[in-house]
Amino acid sequence: MAKEFGRPQRVAQEMQKEIAIILQREIKDPRLGMMTTVSGVEMSRDLAYAKVYVTFLNDKDEAAVKAGIKALQEASGFIRSLLGKAMRLRIVPELTFFYDNSLVEGMRMSNLVTSVVKHDDERRVNPDDSKED
């Protein structure tokens, strides 16, 4: 029987908290002027690699998102050294940052569903309009 919540998941959860604190307090890069949120961390089974998923507050500008990810990648060594001080791990994992667009996609899907429901309600109120198609 496999463990449902093994060591990689527990380390990832703690690492998510620590990286969020580091990004909030320690990183002073002007390319990260927008608020950065750590939405998730995935660890490899041997705890040597971590995929860090981040979102930005004003993520409408594609260039700003790419610049933010690039800034995080360039600061990954510094973040990794601070992680080593904050967490007692035998191996501090190599960090790779990715933009997490799941929240944006979720909001887009929610807006689509809302607009379809609204359009359907309008068609029920005015059934004559649908016969013109």
From Swiss-Prot:
InterPro entries: KH_dom-like_a/b, RbfA, RbfA_dom_sf, Ribosome-bd_factorA_CS. It comes from the Bacteria. GO terms for molecular function: ribosomal small subunit binding. It is found in: Cytoplasm. Its main location: cytoplasm. Keywords: Cytoplasm, Ribosome biogenesis. GO terms for biological process: maturation of SSU-rRNA. It holds the Pfam family RBFA. GO terms for cellular component: cytosol. One of several proteins that assist in the late maturation steps of the functional core of the 30S ribosomal subunit. Associates with free 30S ribosomal subunits (but not with 30S subunits that are part of 70S ribosomes or polysomes). Required for efficient processing of 16S rRNA. May interact with the 5'-terminal helix region of 16S rRNA. Monomer. Binds 30S ribosomal subunits, but not 50S ribosomal subunits or 70S ribosomes. NCBIfam families: rbfA. Belongs to the RbfA family. This is Ribosome-binding factor A. The gene is rbfA.
